[in-house]
Amino acid sequence: MMIDQIAQESARPAWQTHDHLDDPVMGELRNHFGPDAFTVQPTRTGIPVVWVKREQLLEVMTFLKKLPKPYVMLFDLHGMDERQRTHRQGLPAADFSVFYHLLSIERNRDIMLKVALSEKELNLPTATPLFPNANWYERETWEMFGVVFNGHPNLRRIMLPPTWEGHPLRKDYPARATEFDPFELTRQKEDLEMEALTFKPEEWGMKRGTENEDFMFLNLGPNHPSSHGAFRIILQLDGEEIVDCVPDIGYHHRGAEKMGERQSWHSYIPYTDRIEYLGGCVNEMPYVLAVEKLAGIEVPDRVKTIRVMLSELFRINSHLLYISTFIQDVGGMTPVFFAFTDRQKVYDLVEAITGFRMHPAWFRIGGVAHDLPRGWDRLLRDFLNWMPKRLDSYVKAALKNSILKGRAIGVAAYNSKQALEWGTTGAGLRATGIAFDVRKWRPYSGYENFDFDVPIGNNGDCYDRVMLKVEEVRQSLRILKQCLDNMPEGPFKADHPLTTPPPKERTLQHIETMINHFLQVSWGPVMPANESFQMIEATKGINSYYLTSDGSTVSYRTRVRTPSYPHLQQIPSVIRGSLVSDLIVYLGSIDFVMSDVDR
């Protein structure tokens, strides 16, 4: 029977993923802290997951950061409400947990540290002295779960208004607006909200002036053409010079992670498109790969190549908008209109294949929505013949312009050490000389079968970042040409019980297959209780999904790590001492959208 088959498949280990319990770092940890110091959790994340005691946390992280091949980046930090989780066999008792995901460039390996917390002692020491980018992550973890980080420089709300009450990612917090009392905005409440947004320099350790003169405090945004979305930066100015600044985010926050707890594994796919709304199918990739790890699904080669093709089309589309708007921020208007002509050709191709343009929601658990249509190859070939010359025109007409180069070269530069400290990935990291591209270093969806280069820079400035994007478009065109020439034959879905939706023809076999199809489409597939993780090279850096299944049709915890979030946190450290005009160029060079930051 189909139900028995699902049970058998669920018992198998996930494909192409290992717990890495034999990772050399485990031996190093045991040798230093003792064989019984930790609880090791088997997962389908593909990385060691180690539970450490609260009092050992900073010592363990310091040890990992000082190893001969160190774990130099705090890739992610967040929490989980463990109180309603039923499948916790072998794990330390916990009401809540906080995880620290560390990354080593030299090892090309990760490790995840977890700390169990009781509701009565919901506190941890801050990790900001070790990893400065822990600042925002700890603020968000306190905001969403109520975990207090002792010693944090400014533990306050980050995604939600200052007046918000409660911790939304707790399991006892309502997930729908209809579960709250009707919202009413009185004049008194409106005044209170506006007062709460008033910037008070003293709360951020800023002085209002010197003995001789006052500083100016200026709001850039949240509605400003150069802030690239609903994003506010409070500038502390001495004339035109930026003494300090405070990025203020959250205006675009939609509760994407909370939504993951009430959507089925299948019905959450459209939400992934909207995390970074320019990325389209790129955003779907880490989510469906993480779910497929939970399910133990290996997709056909044709599916892998189709996914790569759609991802690279969206990468080009996003990069073209970035390149043209960067030029616009510096003062050149014409390339924006050129770019929209070129992007229209990409959208026409995407629409012909998927039926939609910006948000196709086209990848599926175990495959894609449908096979490639007749004529897709002709459309792709026409685009590949068109784009290279157009790309050259951007470089010749604008990016080699002496005025643009004068505004961008040497501006907002940082080195590789600083990039790693702040969790910078993507072109922002590669511009400092580190060729870390997940498609090359940790291939997924068959990227190991494609021939392409990873461009790098040397100066880590605005000009390096934009020129890297130009070269990345060229490399994406190379990948697309290989997709065109070497598209495998075969099915567009995996033959697996948890492929969703299941192949329609199965419903015609007997009543069990019809029941299974009905349940998977209406309620969603039941994923084995476990944890999985997948990172990918998205358009703006590394995007990842960390999924926790409790053996049901919905995710127990969906953690979305986006690249733009740490990139904006880095702004003050880079731009202090520069001019306001340099900040505009720097913002244009980061490549971010606020949906990616705020989720």
Curated annotation (Swiss-Prot):
List every stretch annotated NADH dehydrogenase I subunit C: 1-190
Q: Which domain of life is it from?
A: Bacteria
Entry's Gene Ontology molecular function annotations: NAD binding; NADH dehydrogenase (ubiquinone) activity; NADH:ubiquinone reductase (non-electrogenic) activity; quinone binding
- Reactions accelerated catalytically: a quinone + NADH + 5 H(+)(in) = a quinol + NAD(+) + 4 H(+)(out)
PROSITE patterns on file: COMPLEX1_30K (PS00542), COMPLEX1_49K (PS00535)
InterPro entries reported in the protein's UniProt record: NADH_DH_suC (IPR010218), NADH_DH_suCD (IPR023062), NADH_Q_OxRdtase_suD (IPR001135), NADH_quin_OxRdtase_su_C/D-like (IPR037232), NADH_UbQ_OxRdtase_30kDa_su (IPR001268), NADH_UbQ_OxRdtase_49kDa_CS (IPR014029), NADH_UbQ_OxRdtase_CS (IPR020396), NDH1_su_D/H (IPR022885)
List each coiled-coil range. none
Q: What is its EC number?
A: 7.1.1.-
Q: Identify which top EC class this enzyme belongs to.
A: translocase
Q: Keywords, A to Z?
A: Cell inner membrane, Cell membrane, Membrane, Multifunctional enzyme, NAD, Quinone, Translocase, Transport, Ubiquinone
Chain intervals for the UniProt region annotation (NADH dehydrogenase I subunit D): 214-599
User: Gene3D superfamilies, alphabetically?
Assistant: Cytochrome-c3 Hydrogenase, chain B (1.10.645.10), NADH:ubiquinone oxidoreductase, 30kDa subunit (3.30.460.80)
Q: Does the keyword Membrane apply?
A: yes
Topology of this chain in the membrane: Peripheral membrane protein
Q: Name one GO cellular component term.
A: plasma membrane
Where is the protein situated, by its record's location annotation?
A: Cell inner membrane
| Main localization, broad class | membrane
Report quaternary structure and partners. NDH-1 is composed of 13 different subunits. Subunits NuoB, CD, E, F, and G constitute the peripheral sector of the complex.
- Protein family membership: In the N-terminal section; belongs to the complex I 30 kDa subunit family.
What function does the entry list?
Answer: NDH-1 shuttles electrons from NADH, via FMN and iron-sulfur (Fe-S) centers, to quinones in the respiratory chain. The immediate electron acceptor for the enzyme in this species is believed to be ubiquinone. Couples the redox reaction to proton translocation (for every two electrons transferred, four hydrogen ions are translocated across the cytoplasmic membrane), and thus conserves the redox energy in a proton gradient.
Its protein name is NADH-quinone oxidoreductase subunit C/D
